[in-house]
Amino acid sequence: VRSSAAADVYERQAPTTEHPGGSPLNVAVGLARLGRRTQLATRFADDDHGRIVRDHIESNGIQLCPCSDEALTTATATARLASDGQASYHFDLTWDLPRLDISDETIVVHTGSIASWTAPGRDHVRDVMDRAKEQATVTYDPNVRPDLLDDPESARLLIENCVSRADVVKASDEDLHWLHPGDDLRTIARHWLDLGPSLVVITCGGSGILALTDRGLSLSIPSHPAKVVDTVGAGDSFMSGLLDGLWSAELLGVEHRDDLAAVDEATLRRILTRCAHIGAITVSRAGANPPTLADLGEDARN
C-alpha cells in the first residue's frame, strides 16, 4: 500500500482527540485486520504525531517500508465532525515518499488520496503504479479533498492520470459530483472504464453502491443498516473489504487480470454486499476503526 500518513485531529464539542490516519494507511489497517499480510510505504517524522502513526502501524501487524519515518514533520488532518457524524477536513502537510521495491510475491498495490495528486509525491505514486502493473493488480481511490485541489478541471487531469493506470477504482458519489458537476454517476464510471480499469465501484452512502465493469456488467447494491457515529474512514474500510473480497475470489494478481475483467454478477454482488457490512460497522463507531474478521463473525485465516 502506497500512502500518505497523518495524525487525524478530531474536533467536536467534546475535547479534541488525536488518532493516526491517512486514507491508504486506513486501507492497510483494514486489510491487516482481515488477515492479509500488508506492507506500507508512507512518510512521517520521528515526532509526537509520527509516534502515534508508528504505534498504529506496528500494533496492527503491518510491515513498514524502509525510510518511511524520515520526514521532517508528520502531516496532520483536522476532522471537524458535524452533529450527524459527517466529517470535513483541514490539512497541514508537506510530503514525499520513499522508493518502493515491488517483490515478486506482490499480489496487489493500492494507492490513492493525497498521495496520488499532491506534488512531489504524486510522481513517485505514478512510477509505482506503472512498475506494479507489470506484476500485480493496481487499485486506486482518489478520495478527493477539495480544500487541497485547485478546481475540478485541473483535479480531473491529475486523478484520471492515476485512473488510467489502475485495474480497480473505487470512489464516492461526492468525489464524482465534485469532479464532474451535473454528470450522471454511471456516465462518469463508464468514462473511467474507457481509460483502462476493469472495475469501477462508486459508494453512495445510505443510497448504496454502484459497480460497473468494462465487460458491461452493472450492479446496484443496497447499503447495510447502521447507526452512524461518524463517517471517518468508512470508504477506506470499504476499500479494504473490496480488496479482501477480490483476493478471496482469486481475482487479484497479474495472472488473474482477465478473470477480474470477466467477474460474474454473483461473485461481485457477494463481495460488495460484504463491503457494505464492513462500511456499516466502521460508521457505527468513532474514528477510522475498521472491523476484524471476528467483528464480521468470520473465522481467522491460517
Write out the residue ranges for each language-model feature.
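Histidine-anchored nucleotide/phosphate-binding helix
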Residues: 24-33, 128-130
